């Protein structure tokens, strides 16, 4: 039986009541550039005063090179189909995204209309105009858009368009590019979460999160809201062990970023899950206590309260 002194007990007033609230500036979502450190910004190498031998230095930099190995993605327009609505017909293109360099078991597949590509192009031109001078966007046709010949040609043109975009560093790291490939699915998933459709939300998140992780490899914390949404779904579906495993993934991505709006609520949820699973919660509780000592505030939002606010528009 849970006691008032333990997480889950009826009288427990631990981490949740002390969860961190954020100032308006802190809770704003990250900017469109997802400005997180990449290999060129890494500062954790050996100093000039290091006593490491030449061999040790070589081994260290080999590990660093492996750690920051650039994720390369390939884009393929695998197929196309004609979607019929009451008053219109249009083509849906199946975009397949594959990570190179190793076997990719999480091949991502999404569907987008030509108009979706058009919106992406307009948004990118607005931000990166001069950098896109070598990128050709497939022109719009007034007639024949549903012919087999046009669809085949456009599949090849859109594949080349994505390849050229991805070759531009600023574009592939932009929020616009990541949103183009993930936002519709994330919006649907979070909508299902708000509606209490946890199984459907979990299915959608399970397919889109691996793609989001690949697209935002330069910014490890970017997928944290989606990972936390998966935790909430699994927890409410009474699958605590899986929820805890997903929470560990989210914590690894946050690292020591105590100022992140998800840091304390996630730790609070993990403490409760650890207690329910009979796991050692001392380390998690210690991290949460230290965070609250350094940033003493009143009660903040729970993890579920945070996740249901994401992707509202």
From Swiss-Prot:
GO terms for molecular function: phosphatidylinositol phosphate binding; phosphatidylinositol-3-phosphate binding; phosphatidylinositol-4,5-bisphosphate binding. Keywords: Cell membrane, Cytoplasm, Endosome, Lipid-binding, Membrane, Nucleus, Phosphoprotein, Protein transport, Transport. Residues 71-188 form the PX domain. One of its GO terms (cellular component) is nucleoplasm. It is found in: Early endosome membrane; Cell membrane; Cytoplasm; Nucleus. It is a peripheral membrane protein. The modification Phosphoserine is found at residue 3. GO terms for biological process: protein transport. Residues 1-61 are annotated as: Disordered. A 1,2-diacyl-sn-glycero-3-phospho-(1D-myo-inositol-3-phosphate) binds at residues 113, 115, 140, 154. Residues 45-55 have a biased composition (Polar residues). Pfam families: PX. PROSITE patterns: PX (PS50195). Residues 29-38 have a biased composition (Pro residues). Belongs to the sorting nexin family. Interacts with SELPLG. Interaction with SELPLG is controversial. The PX domain binds phosphatidylinositol 3-phosphate which is necessary for localization to the endosomes. May play a role in cellular vesicle trafficking. Has been proposed to function as a sorting protein that targets SELPLG into endosomes, but has no effect on SELPLG internalization from the cell surface, or on SELPLG-mediated cell-cell adhesion. This is Sorting nexin-20. It comes from Rattus norvegicus. The gene is Snx20.
